[in-house]
Amino acid sequence: MDHRSKELFERAQQLIPGGVNSPVRACLGVDSDPLFVAHAKGSHLTTVDGTSFVDYVQSWGPMLLGHAHPVVASAIHAAVDRGTSYGAPCEDEVVLAEAVIDALPGVEMVRMVNSGTEATMSALRLARGVTGRNKVVKFVGCYHGHADAFLASAGSGVATLSIPGTPGVPEATVRDTLLAPYNDLTAVAELFTLHGKDIAAIIVEPVAGNMGLVLPMNGFLQGLRDLCTEHGALLIFDEVITGFRVNYGGAQKRFDITPDLTTLGKIIGGGLPVGAYGGRADLMRRIAPCGEVYQAGTLSGNPLAMAAGIATLAELKKSDYDALEARVAALATELQAILAAKGVPVRVNTIASMFTVFFTDQPVTDFASAKTANAALYTSYYKQMRDKGIYLAPSPFEAAMVSFAHTDADLAALLDAARAITLSA
């Protein structure tokens, strides 16, 4: 069935480390080989073998409008004809910046970069430069890209592959990364008691999406805001996943918490290689060339990504987020009932247009509880669902993503597939 994908994977393994350009794509966490994609449209992707799947990965989140949305595609095609890279400012940079600032309450100025990792590492550099402090608080199981400061006890592919420690990261960098369990305000307060004068920032996924989907408990985000204000540290919201997905104004608008700095990912470029970081104007003016904190990039503000971003945000701004959330909430409720009826422990966490299936009988509120989920059950679930045309994240520590392009028939296909599979505890 997947002969062409297998052939390409064998070739790739001789040329590319692990045969993939990002580790989780190797599907090692679900004991499978990766599928090679030929093309994608709307809620579906088609492999090089011609097999079509309902896609619940959506390029790991940014394709909220679905793949190859006609308005976004047209904007990209038009931009190509104007030139693919200038290395100089263009009007679309200004227009996209205006749209981002208009949407996000905590962003008064914004700097475009090329990835979520660039955004988070640049935001942390700015926080350190502004405060004159070195330490950062991050949460166990949260993933903020592959910059050195963020790899300690990280989620996403680091968790999926069970990579121990942080090989290649200097010990001094590791020592400057302070860890706390997600949703544990007491632990964060204790870190400030011990290291408060040295902490530059807290960085947090306001909704964790890289240990599976874990929601913030009541008061958690406000508590982080209060601790940062009290101790003169900056609060960084990593909204690479949540930005423009949980709300057009991001998690900061949904939860009414204003961070000092915000990081964004590929959704602001319609899935193209782009990211951004922004925040209070007084902080952002500390970045070169108007300030002393240096950050640069030849492809930052790339005209293709800017054009795609303008089109994407314009479409998202007029989309019905509440209706999509209601559909996904109903899907998650029904999916949990279907799987529970098979006699396996299961919890389905959901918010907005995301959900994660955890095969555990306890609430999942942090990475420790996420790891109680039965990985072997998830592997069986993944393989059987894939065999039935449902493309899920090849890791128990990622969220499923639903787009505005997913039809009721697409959601029904997932539920029908879940009914048809066999699981045993």
From Swiss-Prot:
Enzyme Commission number, as recorded: 5.4.3.8
Record protein name field:
Glutamate-1-semialdehyde 2,1-aminomutase
Name the family the entry cites.
Answer: Belongs to the class-III pyridoxal-phosphate-dependent aminotransferase family. HemL subfamily.
Recorded GO MF terms: glutamate-1-semialdehyde 2,1-aminomutase activity; pyridoxal phosphate binding; transaminase activity
Which Pfam families does this one have?
Aminotran_3 (PF00202)
Q: Which reaction equations make up its catalytic activity?
A: (S)-4-amino-5-oxopentanoate = 5-aminolevulinate
In terms of InterPro entries, this protein maps to: 4pyrrol_synth_GluAld_NH2Trfase, Aminotrans_3, PyrdxlP-dep_Trfase, PyrdxlP-dep_Trfase_major, PyrdxlP-dep_Trfase_small
Q: Which GO terms describe its cellular component?
A: cytoplasm
Cofactor(s) the protein needs: pyridoxal 5'-phosphate
| Key words of the record | Cytoplasm, Isomerase, Porphyrin biosynthesis, Pyridoxal phosphate
**Compartments reported by the entry:** Cytoplasm
Task: List every position bearing N6-(pyridoxal phosphate)lysine.
Answer: 266
Query: Is Isomerase given among the entry's keywords?
Result: yes
* Protein's gene: hemL
Could you describe the subunit structure of this protein?
Answer: Homodimer.
Natural source organism: Nitratidesulfovibrio vulgaris (strain DSM 19637 / Miyazaki F) (Desulfovibrio vulgaris)
Write out the pathway annotation from the protein's UniProt entry.
Answer: Porphyrin-containing compound metabolism; protoporphyrin-IX biosynthesis; 5-aminolevulinate from L-glutamyl-tRNA(Glu): step 2/2
List the CDD domains hit by this protein, alphabetically: OAT_like
Q: Which GO terms describe its biological process?
A: protoporphyrinogen IX biosynthetic process
